[in-house]
Curated annotation (Swiss-Prot):
GO terms for molecular function: ATP binding; ATP hydrolysis activity; magnesium ion binding; P-type potassium transmembrane transporter activity. Belongs to the cation transport ATPase (P-type) (TC 3.A.3) family. Type IA subfamily. It is an enzyme of class 7 (translocase). Mg(2+) binds at residues 518, 522. Its EC number is 7.2.2.6. It holds the Pfam family Hydrolase. It is found in: Cell inner membrane. Part of the high-affinity ATP-driven potassium transport (or Kdp) system, which catalyzes the hydrolysis of ATP coupled with the electrogenic transport of potassium into the cytoplasm. This subunit is responsible for energy coupling to the transport system and for the release of the potassium ions to the cytoplasm. This is Potassium-transporting ATPase ATP-binding subunit. NCBIfam families: ATPase_P-type, kdpB. The gene is kdpB. Signal peptide: none annotated. CDD domains: P-type_ATPase_K.
Amino acid sequence: MSRNQLALFDAALMRVALLDALKKLDPRTQVRNPVMFVVWLGSVVTTLLAVAMAAGKTPGDTGFTVAISVWLWFTVLFANFAEALAEGRSKAQANSLKGVTKTSFAKKLNEAKYGTSHYPVAADTLRKGDWVLVEAGDIIPCDGEVLEGGASVDESAITGESAPVIRESGGDFSSVTGGTRILSDWLVVQCSVNPGETFLDRMIAMVEGATRRKTPNEIALTILLLALTIVLLLATVTLWPFSAWGGNPVSITVLVALLVCLIPTTIGGLLSAIGVAGMSRMLGANVIATSGRAVEAAGDVDVLLLDKTGTITLGNRQATQFLPAAGVSEEQLADAAQLASLADETPEGRSIVVLAKQKFNLRERDLNSMGATFIPFSAQTRMSGVNVQQRAIRKGAADAVRRYIDSNGGQFPGEVNSLVDRVARAGGTPLVVSDGNRVMGVVALKDIVKGGIKERFAELRKMGIKTVMITGDNPLTAAAIAAEAGVDDFLSEATPEAKLALIRQYQAEGRLVAMTGDGTNDAPALAQADVAVAMNSGTQAAKEAGNMVDLDSNPTKLLEVVHIGKQMLMTRGSLTTFSIANDVAKYFAILPAAFAATYPQLNQLNVMGLHSPASAILSAVIFNALVIVFLIPLALKGVSYRALSAAALLRRNLWIYGVGGLLVPFLGIKLIDMLLTVTGLA
C-alpha cells in the first residue's frame, strides 16, 4: 500500500515553508548553493545601491534599481520556498512515523527463556543484547530478534496496513520493530540496538536531517552549474570596460541583472527540491531509503534480480494432479500423499489434502488416532512425511527422494524421472512421493504467474533494463516459468553464494544491480547490490545490509522503486535542459537592452520588440523569478514517466524541455513587458 499523499500545496505546509524560506536567507545557508548564492550577493549589491541612490549618495534611476532589487530577492525566496516546501512534505511524512506509540517500560528478563523471572525497567534504558518479554497488549519496546515464541503483531502504525502479521522465532520473520503492538500470544525478544538507534529513530533522523548529503550526480551537476556561473560572471565583468570604452558605461544594476538572468538560476533554485522530493515520493510508496544516493542509483539500475515467489508468481503453489508410477493407482498415490500432508500446514500441503478429498473422497483421517509420527520438512533432507502403521511415507524434491530411496536399498524408476521432467517443463513443481523404498509417483504443484507481469517486464526491456528471475526450482521448472513470465534470464537452484556471484558478475560488466531480500542468508547479496530493498518483515541482518526498507514487505515494490528513481533523474535532467535553454531567450531580451546606448547596432537583436531597455531588463528579471514558482509543482511531482529507451526519452525531453525552454521565455518576457508598459510601470 501507499501512504496518504499530501496535497501538493497544503496550506499548513505552505505557511511553514514561507517562514523557512525567510530563514534560509542566512548567508551560511545560501552559500551551500553556489548559483543562488551569486543571486543573493547580487540582491545585496542592488539593495545597497538603491539605498545609496535614495539617499542621494549615488546617481542613477532609483525606481529601476529598487524594482530589480525586489525581484532578485524574490528569486532567492522562491528558490528557498521550493526547497522548504519539499523538506516540509518529507517532515510531514516523518511525523506519521513519529506518531508511533512508544512504551514507557519493558519487562526485562534475566534469562532468554519464557517463564523465567522478569522485572519492569524504563524502555529507554534497554541496551543491545538485553532480553525482554512482550505479551498480548504490550508495545514492543525495542528493535530486536525473536528468540522464542510466536505472536500476532499490529504494525499498522509503521506500514499503514491494518492486517496483523505473524512474528516468530527462527526463519525470515523473526525481526520486530519497536513501537509495534502485540495482539496475541507472547514473544521473547533480544534487543538489537541501543536507545536512539532504532529503525524508526534512524529513519526519522534521516528524513528530518538538517543537512541532506548530496548524491554523486547532484554534486557533478552542481559543479557544472558553478563552472557555468563562473564563466558567465567573468564574461559579465569584462563587459563593463567595453561599455566604458564606448563612452557610455553600463550601470552595476544592469550588469547584476544580466548576470542573474544568464546563469542557470532555474535548475540552481530547484535542484535541492528535486532531490528531497524524490526521497519523499519513495516514502509515499512506503519505502524508506537510507540516503538520496540509493534513490539515485535506482534510476540508473539496468539489472533487476527478482525472486520468483511473491514477485513473479503469486507464491501460493497448489496441487493440480496426481501422476502415479508404474504399478501404482492414482488413488494409492493420493492416499500416500494425503497422509504425508495431513500435518503439513504449508499452502502446498493443504492443497494436496484438498485435492485428494475432491478426487477420491479421502477424508476424516486423524493422524493421532492412527499413532502416526509427523516428520517435518528440513533444509538438510528437503523432505517431509509421516511414519504410520509400519509405513514410512515421504514427499519432497526428486533428487532428495532419490537419495532416500537409494539409502534404503530401493530403486528410483526411470518413468518417474520422465514424469518429473514433464511437470517441470510445464512450469510446475514436481513433488515425488514414496512409501518405504517404493516410489509411488509425482504430485504436480502449479504456481500462478501474476497477471500483467509479462507486460511490465516488456516495458522494462524497452528501457534497457534486464530482468533475472531468482528461484530455488530446478532448471526445467525455472525455464518454463521464465518463458511464461517473460523475464530475460533466470538463476535456478539459487543459493546465497550463487546470488552473490551473479551480482558481482554483472557489476564487473559495469552494470548496476537491484534486488530484494528478507532473510539473513540474503544479507551478503543485499550488501553487494547497488540498490538493495530489504523487507520490513525480514531479519535485522537483511535490513541492515540493504539501503532501502519496504514497509509493506512486498517484493514487487522493486519495480516501483526503479520507476521513482528514474523519474527523479529525468526530472533533474529535464529541468536542467529547460534552464539552460531559457538563457538563450533571455540573452536576446537583456543584452541588446543593456548595451543599446553604447552600441545601437545591437537593437537588431531585439527580436521581441520590447518597449524600452529598462522594461526589457526588468521583464527578464521578473520572468527569471516567476519561472521558478511555475516549475515547483513539476519539481515536486516529477516529470511524466514513460517506458521508453534512453535514446527515445532523450529525444522526447529535448523537444519538450529544450525547445520549450527556448520558446517559453520569449512569450513570457514579451507578455510581462506588455503588462509593464500598459500599467505604466516600465
